[in-house]
Amino acid sequence: MSAEIRSLIEKIESSAALLRRRLDWDTATKRLDELTALSERPNFWDDPQEAQAMMRERQKLADGIALVQTLEKDVADAPELMELAEGDASMLADLEATLRRAAARAAEAELAALLSGEADGNDCYLQINAGEGGTESQDWASILRRMYVRWAEKRGYGVELLDERDGEEAGIKSATLQIKGENAYGWLKSEQGVHRLVRISPFDSSARRHTSFSSVAVSPVIDDKIDVEINPSDVRTDTYRASGAGGQHVNRTDSAVRLTHIPTNTVVQCQAGRSQHQNRDEAWKMLRSKLYELELQKRRAVADAQYADKSAIGFGHQIRSYVLQPYQMVKDLRTEVETSDTSGVLDGDIDRFLSAALAASVSKDQDA
């Protein structure tokens, strides 16, 4: 057995054992059986909200148990596969590639197990705002929107566009997405901040290099179990006509809704629904989410300066730099993680940055 394959097997074996312990295996399998039995009762969906929470818990347990079982099977099968592949370089290469993928899944699962914040497992709202710079920044905002949509799609997450304002010539001024999937908020919360792009502008006839900025804000979708008190008198409601894609209802009625929480100057808006009532309900959910995120930021501020009060979108407040010319490099300014695969990153391959940010935040919390 080659040293590389032996090392991969040991890593997978260690990860599987760690994940098994974190699951509390016997308790987890028993709870999964209980939830499965409950879900088969005729009256299970009488309380839809409670039923959905139980189904999410069941799916999370089932996924965790299945992953451990798969990793343990990979380890158990490896010696036999090694024997079959003896002397066959192609089969050995395939086995090593399979084990590398398993080791990568295990490493990510170890990190995901560290997502222990009270809202880390939730869906999230992700808002993108173009900085100053007109068309350049607005085009950059649309590139970021596509990056996050592609990331979500690759993970099997759902994405809903709740609000979007088109740019004057190209791109978007702002967009709000709802990312739906297990740990969506936990993974994406570190994306909050200013993202900087350096490139030769496609809008500049002189082909000069331009620097553009867009900001990203992330907040968890919260349910009624998390209490967020909002005084209705503190909220201003504005309605306006929806814009952008939306079919026959666009621009016919004032169906879009904007809410402004006056004490914090927090603004949310929604135009995805077909009626003002739907958009108002969703906007209130978004506002509760944003105010809850502000509270989380206050709690994190002592340990993490990146969650200090909002600042202007500019050079001094970046979390990541994307350079396309004169060289190609994406670099996270907090973790120092970087890659020259700019096209891959802009196509949604951002897991290396998310994992590094999570690992750094966990390490910092342990040192605090």
UniProtKB/Swiss-Prot annotation:
Keywords: Cytoplasm, Methylation, Protein biosynthesis. The modification N5-methylglutamine is found at Q248. Coiled coil: none annotated. One of its GO terms (cellular component) is cytoplasm. One of its GO terms (molecular function) is translation release factor activity, codon specific. It holds the Pfam family PCRF. InterPro entries: PCRF, Pep_chain_release_fac_I, Pep_chain_release_fac_I_sf, PrfB. Its main location: cytoplasm. Methylated by PrmC. Methylation increases the termination efficiency of RF2. It is found in: Cytoplasm. It comes from the Bacteria. The keyword Glycosyltransferase does not apply. Peptide chain release factor 2 directs the termination of translation in response to the peptide chain termination codons UGA and UAA. Belongs to the prokaryotic/mitochondrial release factor family. This is Peptide chain release factor 2. It comes from Hyphomonas neptunium (strain ATCC 15444). The lineage of its organism: Bacteria, Pseudomonadati, Pseudomonadota, Alphaproteobacteria, Hyphomonadales. The gene is prfB.
